[in-house]
């Protein structure tokens, strides 16, 4: 078997499963208020190297995972995430009912055939929840 054939066989058994973005956050309380209370994510884990160390936290909702990090060098402020959803109108209604004082998002119908709900976290990261126009 040649090196190429061996690589081809290995590649056939490899499956890329998912990506988990790391978003930079600067204030734990604000991050919790936005991601947990407002967007409805749950905490999967929290890690600190010691009591006063920066937080690294895994959150999820409906199988979508995001890592939030206070560590310098993790993530870049102003990151954009496009999140495919089913039920963007229902998500809009859910968020509107929470009356988060820093956010009043709306749904936009894009010319490329998507309905999008865009929110910005307190750290400048943009999350675009998107579904195809029916």
Predicted regions and their residues:
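N-terminal beta-strand motif that seeds the catalytic metal site of vicinal oxygen chelate
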Residues: 2-32, 79-81, 131-134
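Vicinal oxygen chelate
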Residues: 3, 26-29, 81-126
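Core segments of cupin and vicinal oxygen chelate
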Residues: 13-15, 22-65
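Short beta->alpha transition motifs characteristic of CBS
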Residues: 22-24, 45, 111, 118, ...
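A short linear hydrophobic-aromatic micro-motif
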Residues: 42-45, 68, 103-106
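Short acidic/glycine-enriched loop/turn segments that link adjacent beta-strands
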Residues: 50-55, 75-77, 110-115
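Active-site beta-strand termini and strand-to-loop segments that position acidic
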Residues: 59-62, 119-122, 132
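Conserved beta-strand in the GNAT
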Residues: 67-69, 128
């Amino acid at each position: 078997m040649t090196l190429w054939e061996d690589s081809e066989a290995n590649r056939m058994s490899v499956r890329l499963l998912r990506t988990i973005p790391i978003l930079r956050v600067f204030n734990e309380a604000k991050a919790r208020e936005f991601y947990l209370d407002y967007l409805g994510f749950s905490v999967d884990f929290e890690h600190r190297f010691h009591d006063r160390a920066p937080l690294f936290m895994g959150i999820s909702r409906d199988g979508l995972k995001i890592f939030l990090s206070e560590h310098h060098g993790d993530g870049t402020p102003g990151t954009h995430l496009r999140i495919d959803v089913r039920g963007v109108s229902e998500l809009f209604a859910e968020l509107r009912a929470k009356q988060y004082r820093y956010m009043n998002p709306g749904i936009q119908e894009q010319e490329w055939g998507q309905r999008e709900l865009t929110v910005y976290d307190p750290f400048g990261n943009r999350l675009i929840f998107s579904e195809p126009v029916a």
